Design a protein with these regions (language model features):
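Positively charged n-region of N-terminal signal peptides that target proteins for export
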Residues: 1-6
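Bacterial N-terminal signal peptides
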Residues: 7-17
Length: 342
């Protein structure tokens, strides 16, 4: 991690975050190599679409929420919440029969696991669950199977993040120009405090607030995906800044050293959904302090020069462990990949 932080200091000295945003940072070095098939599932269990990955407080255990061997857990009893150790061995699983569309995950300082259910069907979904490390349900936010825009309902909740004081933040809304486009704040006991956001592209407006993360200063980073930017707020919802140099953010992760990891799983040169010309998909690594971009893990399925897509999205969710290994959760290829230093 020392060399990566050093590289970010060099980048910061050469350009400010605003200057970096002028041209797509597609040519940063890739100091990582990909480890395929590192995570081991039980015999007969197949990976489903996977957008959610996080690391526990110890920085070693990898928590994942996958979609039951498909792109939905509806009608399935497979436990979608999985815990892996550093050898890639599955050591715990739970949540079977509870979810429709596991989407976002967060592990708090006490080791509790928070998971969003981003769709609704058959009386399930549109909720946020808090589990103990052993899978006991400790809290439920939202109404099962009910999509809404009130203080006690969600409509396609994307992600959840827990502030240092225990306050709960949920980003709500997965469809551009439709449904919700907001960030909601709750007390640690689940009492609604406030919300902010609406559809749009101005400060504090969102089009798919897809990912949440806190930096060491307690600032909330929101991956405003369909607006091709990250927005930064204080915990009262006051706008601080926006960054576009990390491209079209599907996943955002910030480690204890304020190294930021951002996935772009959608950018394409082709007009239409995902239009973000000139930007390659992949994982950009930089500094949450100044917005500099130091490294880039390119998506092997990234659009070609003529805008054609040779495949679907790769890394959508992202996390990094205490050793600096990076984990990419993939929706289209239905897998979880590990990236280690070369």
């Amino acid at each position: 991690m020392r060399s990566l932080r050093g590289a970010m200091m060099v980048v910061a000295a050469l350009a400010t975050a605003s200057a970096l945003a002028e041209a797509p940072p597609n040519s940063q070095p890739n100091p990582f190599r990909t480890v395929e098939n590192w995570f081991k599932l039980p015999a007969g269990r197949m990976w489903g679409s996977t957008s959610a990955v996080d690391i526990d407080r110890g920085g070693t255990s990898i928590w994942v929420a996958e979609r039951c061997g498909a792109n939905s857990c509806a009608g399935k009893m497979d436990p979608p919440i999985l815990k892996f150790d550093q050898s890639g061995t599955l050591v715990k699983s739970f949540g079977g029969g509870m979810f429709v569309f596991p989407h976002g995950i967060a592990v708090d300082k006490d080791g509790n696991v928070w998971v969003t259910d981003g769709q609704g069907r058959e009386g399930k979904g549109h909720q946020v669950f808090k589990f103990s490390p052993d899978g006991e349900v400790l809290m439920t936010l939202g109404k099962a199977g009910v999509a809404g825009d009130g203080p006690d309902t969600f409509n396609q909740p994307d992600d959840v993040a827990i502030a240092p004081n225990g306050d709960i933040f949920v980003s709500d809304g997965h469809t551009p120009a439709m449904g919700n486009a907001r960030v909601m704040k709750f007390t640690k006991d689940g009492k609604f405090i406030k919300q902010w956001g609406r559809h749009g592209s101005g400060p504090g407006e969102f089009e798919v607030p897809h990912a949440l993360a806190f930096d060491s200063r307690g600032r909330l980073f929101v991956g405003d995906r369909a607006n091709n930017r990250i927005q930064i707020f204080d915990q009262e919802g006051n706008f601080i800044d926006q960054w576009k140099q990390f491209s079209r953010p599907s996943g955002v992760y910030i480690d204890n050293h304020d190294v930021i990891y951002v996935t772009d799983s959608e950018s394409t040169d082709k007009p239409g959904y995902g239009y973000n010309p000139g930007w390659r998909r992949g994982i950009r690594v930089g500094s949450a302090k100044d917005g500099s971009v130091a490294a880039f893990i390119p998506d092997p399925l990234s659009p070609t020069a003529d805008g054609k897509l040779p495949g679907t999205s790769a890394a959508e969710g992202v996390a990094a462990d205490a050793a600096g290994n990076v984990y990419g959760a993939e929706v289209g290829p239905k897998t979880l990949k590990k990236y280690v230093r070369k």
